[in-house]
Every structure is written in C-alpha cells, then in structure tokens.
Amino acid sequence: MNTKDFYSFYDLREMDILSISSKGNDLIILLNADVEMELMANGFRGGFDLSFLQEVTFKDCRININLTSPIDIKRYEYQDDKLVIQANKETIIIPEREVVIKKIKTNHV
C-alpha cells in the first residue's frame, strides 16, 4: 500500500466538517466521504480507500498555525468569513477565503 500526498486548493465553506483535532503541530479535520467525489470530478484518479471518512490536514498558506500538542478542541463555528476553533488554551482563526493546502493520504491500488 503506497501513500501519496495530493495538494489542492479549496474553500473551507465547502467542506463538510465532522470533527477537528490535532496531531503534533497539524490541525486534523475529519471530512465526509463526499470529498472523494469532488476530487475525482476535478480530475484526480487514485483508488481511494476512505473507509467512509477521510482524514485531512489543513495548513493555511499565509498564516502559520502553530498548535501546542496536545490541544483539546472544545468547539468550532463559522463567524463572518472565518472558521473559528475554540481550544483549551487558544483560539484558532482560519480565514475562509485564504488559500488552504489540503494534504490527503491516498491509498493507490
């Protein structure tokens, strides 16, 4: 099983977020499997094995989000044009219209 990183640009408002947590200094956002269909519609082919969910790491290209680990995500919500994540010791604000890199672990068959 090979793992490949695929980078693409998306608007956070279009993501169906199921949960948000952290791993090291990465912000991990669990998405609905519909993301697979959107990627394939945009021309990506690669034999996804999502097991119904897909783990995605978001990093903002213009804002350095440096999380302390471990971090306890309390809640998240959209406020105006921002995704606001309330955590145990800090508030993470991601502008929705900023360019976001999505790192997707895909299983090629």
Task: List each model region and its residues.
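Surface-exposed, interaction-prone regions used to assemble/regulate multi-protein complexes
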Residues: 1-109
